[in-house]
Amino acid sequence: MTVRTRIAPSPTGDPHVGTAYIALFNLCFARQHGGKFILRIEDTDQARSTTESEQDILSALRWLGLEWDEGPDVGGPHAPYRQSERKDSYRAYAEELVAKGRAYYCFRTPEELDVIREERKAQGLPPGIKGDLELPDDEVKRRLAAGEPHVIRMKVPDEGVCVVKDMLRGDIEIDWGQVDCQILLKSDGMPTYHLANVVDDHLMEITHVIRGEEWINSAPKHMLLYQYFGWEMPTLCHMPLLRNPDKTKLSKRKNPTSINFYERLGVMPEALLNYLGRMGWSMPDESEKFTLDQMIENFDIKRVSLGGPVFDIVKLRWLNGLWMRENLSETQFLERLVHWSYNNDYAAKMIPHVQSRAETFSDVAPLAAFMFSGYLPIKQEDFAASKLEEEQLKKVLQYSLWRLEAQRHWTKENIFADLKALSKAMSVKMGDFMMPIFVSIAGTPNSWSVVDSMETLGPDMTRARLRFALEVLGGLSKKGLKAAEKEFAQISAAIDATEKN
């Protein structure tokens, strides 16, 4: 048997360090066993998937030094490697299950399903949708003939226990009563993750599924689908989730999660990959610094610890410092520095702003220094010139951060539209609103267009600086944060409603 592993990211946002973490362990497992590592794009969420995000993911993983044997950009015997290009095949598999009596057509509206969930909740039952939605055959035929919108759901046992076998965790028992009748095919004909994932893993001959522990509760559905189709199931291995220093799940609301952020911060790809390799795993000799080749040579999946590995930027910076001092000659250091700081693509975006303000070339460094920094050395006094009360100032930064977290198309036009809409909704003059934004992003209220800077810096660096500015100001209290979340939800809903009209 040839070992075949895969990583299957969704192109719906910035390339996440969690994706790189799982990709690294899949790659090491495959290479250590002389197998193949496959990259597949899971773009079944057509509303959120973008080609830009896909390219960002591929570029970021390659920047780290991860290479795949098959994928959308390199091809392979199981092409295509984008689920959107395979969508015509999924309906046949879903209907095969209907014909076998393992799935059924569901015509319930979202409103009807909400009522059912509330009724189950009131009865003290799990809110998941169970099999009582199935209709008599004659009614199904009538509704299908009438062209009524429908989905296809899988059937799930009402009682009993499912035993999931895991390489790291042994037997995991999950009550079937907790498992809902998962939608397999959506009303638009696109498969859900669960159907597409199982079908593609089978067709691509995946032997080992190494993924995050957040998928444990989905494992019973996947086991059932393999059973229903009569296919051999891959071996499962659920990796521990990356955590923030406070042990909560790693998320962009608390820490930068984009690989692009760490590249812009000036972290070496070798160091970031090394750090991800230490997330829940260690070398046999406990050495902290190692290359990808060394990790592959010594890799044993059984050495993974199930304790939540903490992704700590302070420790990453320390490790990166070791790499810079111990692995780069002075010439190599200079080459990397020049490539990082003055690569044409990045620098070209700043030239119009710098050239129009500079009188000598020596003016360039002070004018553009904030564009070549990570976190800025700002202090509370830097916001002293603001005309806003302290709590209102914090809300401006907090609401801007939350609003921009939802921005999927990172352009200066969209950034400005978001900030302008917030300014209006909060009844704060645009100039007063933008002042703390300028300080947070540029370190001073006197800089070139801050939205241009935000576009160039990228979403993760922008959000990191806004988050850091809030920390400098002391942030909102727990009580204040709860009230702010409620107020922001109302403001955001009003803005969205206005934009639709």
UniProtKB/Swiss-Prot annotation:
Task: Tell me where in or outside the cell this protein is found.
Answer: Cytoplasm
- NCBIfam families to which the protein is assigned, alphabetical: gltX_bact
Query: What is the residue range of the motif 'KMSKS' region?
Result: 249-253
Q: Which residues form the signal peptide?
A: none
An annotated GO BP: glutamyl-tRNA aminoacylation
The gene is gltX
What's the main place this protein lives? cytoplasm
**What organism, scientifically named, is this protein from?**
Hahella chejuensis (strain KCTC 2396)
Where's the motif 'HIGH' region? 9-19
Spell out the molecular function terms from Gene Ontology: ATP binding; glutamate-tRNA ligase activity; tRNA binding; zinc ion binding
UniProt xrefs under PANTHER family: GLUTAMATE--TRNA LIGASE (PTHR43311), GLUTAMATE--TRNA LIGASE, MITOCHONDRIAL-RELATED (PTHR43311:SF2)
Chain positions recorded as ATP binding sites: K252
Q: Which family is annotated?
A: Belongs to the class-I aminoacyl-tRNA synthetase family. Glutamate--tRNA ligase type 1 subfamily.
Pfam hit, one = tRNA-synt_1c
Biological function: Catalyzes the attachment of glutamate to tRNA(Glu) in a two-step reaction: glutamate is first activated by ATP to form Glu-AMP and then transferred to the acceptor end of tRNA(Glu).
Q: Name one GO cellular component term.
A: cytosol
Which Enzyme Commission number(s) are on file for it? 6.1.1.17
| Entry protein name | Glutamate--tRNA ligase
Q: Which reaction does it catalyse?
A: tRNA(Glu) + L-glutamate + ATP = L-glutamyl-tRNA(Glu) + AMP + diphosphate
User: Oligomeric state and partners?
Assistant: Monomer.
Going by the UniProt record, its keywords in alphabetical order are: Aminoacyl-tRNA synthetase, ATP-binding, Cytoplasm, Ligase, Nucleotide-binding, Protein biosynthesis
Which enzyme type, at the first EC level?
A: ligase
